[in-house]
Amino acid sequence: MFDIKLINTEFDDVIQQKIDTKTKPLGALGDLETLALQIARVLGKDKPQIRNPKMMVFAADHGIADSGVSIAPSEVTTQMVVNFINGGAAINVFTRQVGFDLEVIDCGILKPIENLEGVIDQRLGAGTGPIHKRAAMTLGAVKQGFKMATDRVELHHQNGCNLIALGEMGIGNTSSAAAIMAALTGMKAEDCVGRGTGIDATTFKRKKMLVEQALLMHHCELDDPMQVLACLGGFEIVQMTGAMLAAAERNMLVIVDGFIATAAALAAIKINPNVREYMIFAHQSDEKGHVMMLEFLQAKPLLKLGMKLGEGTGAALALPLIQAAVNFYNEMASFADAGIEI
């Protein structure tokens, strides 16, 4: 479905030698050195550059939200999309600060927003089905979502972008992400479900019960990651998954945000494992399950700030660190350049 090249490690020794001979002790820049190696593998060993980075925020509603798994009603998804367009959300503040170009994509909120310019229409429906009662969507909708996401990534690629970051908005989407995590890792639902928007104990118990119910209902169809997305996914999660795969196919880097985005990343890796090396995991969120999912993927996030907002906020904050890794690799003098003998 996606022709993703296995990362070329042929020049790892050359890249590592360039890193090791900078004017610093070996390993002194820690995880930035590992990051620089990854970036040079993808974007080129000589002088990699981050070009036209794009923050893509995908929004959609979830049928399970009507069963009381969140403190917020589904209408908040639409209200937050309006907030994004008006520039008033955390993701707007952070993307302005770090120089990310932001776009907002309606993948399937309850109702289209009329008379609001700036929202990109990639609707797959008016919210998903309640996953504890029936499939979230058809397999055809998953494939359509992949096509939409691919077309959008291709547009950015044609405009010179070589790095995308993915954020989301969707009341109820932590339930969907937890179900995807459980299905694709084999972990227990109770270990994957967290408190999301800050729900109380009663709501938390209900949320775990409904996710377990969803996993039992769709059990016979959960061997295939595409079917997992159809049964348990969200329209925004599907399109994030497709965008990750499409970006890797085009030799672009992908910044993965928090819990929801990591569930999409997990699905993408199950579909095509080669996508993994194109992913940079931005942060460890405070949502229960994220640590275990990161460990399952053997992913070491750049930041740990106790955040659990979503929207792509962690991914936005990671961009300066990614740029710092590129800059030290390209611009820092070697011992020979500096005339330092050791």
From Swiss-Prot:
It is an enzyme of class 2 (transferase). It catalyses: 5,6-dimethylbenzimidazole + nicotinate beta-D-ribonucleotide = alpha-ribazole 5'-phosphate + nicotinate + H(+). Pathway: Nucleoside biosynthesis; alpha-ribazole biosynthesis; alpha-ribazole from 5,6-dimethylbenzimidazole: step 1/2. One of its GO terms (biological process) is cobalamin biosynthetic process. Pfam families: DBI_PRT. Its EC number is 2.4.2.21. Keywords: Cobalamin biosynthesis, Glycosyltransferase, Transferase. The active site is at E311. It comes from the Bacteria. GO terms for molecular function: nicotinate-nucleotide-dimethylbenzimidazole phosphoribosyltransferase activity. Gene3D superfamilies: 1.10.1610.10, 3.40.50.10210. PANTHER family: NICOTINATE-NUCLEOTIDE--DIMETHYLBENZIMIDAZOLE PHOSPHORIBOSYLTRANSFERASE. Belongs to the CobT family. Catalyzes the synthesis of alpha-ribazole-5'-phosphate from nicotinate mononucleotide (NAMN) and 5,6-dimethylbenzimidazole (DMB). This is Nicotinate-nucleotide--dimethylbenzimidazole phosphoribosyltransferase. It comes from Shewanella halifaxensis (strain HAW-EB4). The gene is cobT.
